[in-house]
Amino acid sequence: MGHKVHPTGIRLGIAKDWNSKWYASKADFAAYLAADLKVREMLRKKLAQAGISKILIERPAKTARVTIHTARPGVVIGKRGEDIEKLRKEVSEMMGVPAHINVTEVRKPELDAQLVAESIAQQLERRIMFRRAMKRSVGNAMRLGALGIKVNVAGRLNGAEIARSEWYREGRVPLHTLRADIDYGFAEASTTYGIIGIKVWIYKGEVFDFSQVGQEKQDDSPRNDRNDRGDRGDRPSRPAREAR
């Protein structure tokens, strides 16, 4: 099942959190969801050059709080905060409530799957060889601490008449492990030959809850091991032999 479902959707509540956090009645739920989708679409179009990783939306007490995770916060904020103020007014009109916009910087964009996918898409649009773009992104992610990464590109690669898909992986990407922290991103490259889809999976480690972390700490408590015996530990003492 790990290869059939969305890597983020199957891990919600286990290793991943929701991008929208609010409660609504049945009558308002559809309107809230539609507004969230429109706001995200508008922000991604206007901030296409800002390297948007994800957009979190919260609705506390008849207000809206939008958190934009970006690799280039200066592009979002603008000179003296003029651009972000325009965005705030537009978001308030779309959502119908006062809105606040927070900007969070992505420290390592090479470890963000969405940003990696968009970077590969931009390279393909500049007619860079897809294998070179894939290997460069994989190498940067592994160098900065990723435990595994997989990149899949599909379409008319290098202008071939027949579309195909190719993938490159380094490290391990356990899609069947629900507690695995796997970041997933998707982007499309519009080339002269057609659209090329890029999918990226980045494995960053495992997520444990507090009870499991406590158990691990107990299991990892130091034992009375001897240096010359490695990990075998102390052996039970034998009774001394009687002298003849």
UniProtKB/Swiss-Prot annotation:
The UniProt subunit note reads as follows: Part of the 30S ribosomal subunit. Forms a tight complex with proteins S10 and S14.
Q: Which gene encodes it?
A: rpsC
Biased composition (Basic and acidic residues) is annotated at: 216-244
Similarity section: Belongs to the universal ribosomal protein uS3 family.
**Keyword Manganese in record:** no
GO cellular component term of the entry, any: cytosolic small ribosomal subunit
Where do the segments described as Disordered lie?
213-244
- Write down the Pfam families for this protein, in alphabetical order: KH_2, Ribosomal_S3_C
Q: Name one GO molecular function term.
A: mRNA binding
Q: What CDD domains does the database record attribute to this sequence?
A: KH-II_30S_S3 (cd02412)
Q: Name one GO biological process term.
A: translation
For this UniProt record, give its keywords in alphabetical order, as a comma-separated list: Ribonucleoprotein, Ribosomal protein, RNA-binding, rRNA-binding
The KH type-2 domain extends over: 39-107
Annotated source species: Xanthomonas campestris pv. campestris (strain ATCC 33913 / DSM 3586 / NCPPB 528 / LMG 568 / P 25)
> What's the protein called, per UniProt?
Small ribosomal subunit protein uS3
SMART domains, A to Z: KH
Coiled coil residues, start to end? none
Function as written in the Swiss-Prot or TrEMBL entry? Binds the lower part of the 30S subunit head. Binds mRNA in the 70S ribosome, positioning it for translation.
